[in-house]
C-alpha cells in the first residue's frame, strides 16, 4: 500500500479506515514520523502539523512579547520554532522563556518561565525577538524533551550548520544542570546525515530495540544501471 495520504489538514481515524488503512498502518505511519495524532481519533500529516504548530506558536510568541517584562528570553520549544527546528505540539503548548537567574521556574496557563544562567553569547535576535542561540536551544531541548523529539531537533540543527564542538562547549557550561546526562546522550546520538524527522525518529526506535546504529544515506549499488534511493544500512 502506498503511504501517500490524500488528506486535508485533519483526517479522522474512521475516514482513514474507510480509505483502506488499518490500525496497524496508522501505528506504523505514526512511528515513522509521517502521521501525527493531534488528538484521539484524529491525525494529520507531519509536515502539515509542523506548519500549523509553527504559525500558531509564532502568534503566541508575538502576543507574549508585547506583555513580558525586560529580561525574558524565548527558549526551549519557543526558540525551536523561531530557529526552524521541528517541534511536537506538546513542546509548545506554552510559550517558554528563560530569565538569567537561578532557581525554580514558574508555569502559568500560557507562559512557562525557566530560571537558569544565560550568557550574552547564548542570546540572539530573530525577527527582533530575543531568543536563545541555536546551541543553547538544542541543549535545552535535549535536557527536557523525550529523546525522539530532541534528536529530531538536534539533527535538523546540525543540518543548519551547528557543530558538535559548539554543543560540546555548551554542555561543559551545563555541568550539574538537571537533565545534562540525557543531553550528553542526545548529542552523542545526533547525525547530520539524517534527512527527515521520520529518519531521526526511526534511528531512536532502532536504538531502543537494541539494534545497531544504521549507516545513513547508504548508496546501494546493483549490477543494473538503476539508481536506488539511499537509505539505512544496518550492520
Short names for language-model regions:
Residues 188, 192, 196-224:
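A mid-sequence, solvent-exposed acidic-amphipathic segment
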Residues 1-179, 203-205, 212-215:
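Short gly/ser-rich loop at a beta-strand->alpha-helix junction or flexible surface loop bordering the NTP-binding
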Residues 104-106, 212-235:
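Active-site metal-binding core of divalent-cation-utilizing nuclease and nuclease-like domains
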Residues 179-190:
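A short, surface-exposed helix-loop junction/capping segment
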Amino acid at each position: 500500500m502506498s503511504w501517500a495520504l490524500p488528506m486535508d489538514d485533519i483526517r479522522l481515524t474512521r475516514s482513514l479506515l474507510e480509505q483502506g488503512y488499518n490500525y496497524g498502518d496508522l501505528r506504523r505511519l505514526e512511528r515513522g514520523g509521517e502521521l501525527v495524532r493531534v488528538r484521539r481519533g484524529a491525525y494529520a500529516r507531519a509536515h502539515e502539523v509542523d506548519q500549523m504548530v509553527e504559525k500558531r506558536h509564532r502568534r503566541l510568541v508575538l502576543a507574549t512579547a508585547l506583555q513580558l517584562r525586560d529580561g525574558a528570553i524565548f527558549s526551549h520549544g519557543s526558540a525551536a520554532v523561531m530557529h526552524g527546528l521541528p517541534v511536537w505540539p506538546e513542546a509548545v503548548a506554552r510559550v517558554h522563556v528563560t530569565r538569567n537567574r537561578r532557581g525554580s521556574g514558574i508555569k502559568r496557563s500560557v507562559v512557562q518561565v525557566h530560571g537558569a544562567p544565560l550568557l550574552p553569547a547564548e542570546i540572539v535576535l530573530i525577527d527582533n525577538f530575543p531568543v536563545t542561540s541555536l546551541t543553547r536551544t538544542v541543549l535545552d531541548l535535549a535536557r527536557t524533551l523525550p529523546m525522539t523529539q530532541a534528536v529530531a531537533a538536534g539533527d535538523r540543527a546540525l543540518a543548519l550548520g551547528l557543530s558538535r564542538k559548539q554543543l560540546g562547549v555548551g554542555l561543559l557550561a551545563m555541568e550539574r544542570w538537571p537533565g545534562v546526562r540525557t543531553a550528553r546522550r542526545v548529542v552523542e546520538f545526533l547525525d547530520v546525515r539524517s534527512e527527515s524527522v521520520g529518519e531521526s525518529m526511526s534511528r531512536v526506535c532502532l536504538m531502543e530495540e537494541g539494534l545497531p546504529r544504521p549507516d545513513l544515506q547508504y548508496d546501494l549499488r546493483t549490477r543494473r544501471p538503476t539508481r536506488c534511493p539511499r537509505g539505512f544500512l544496518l550492520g
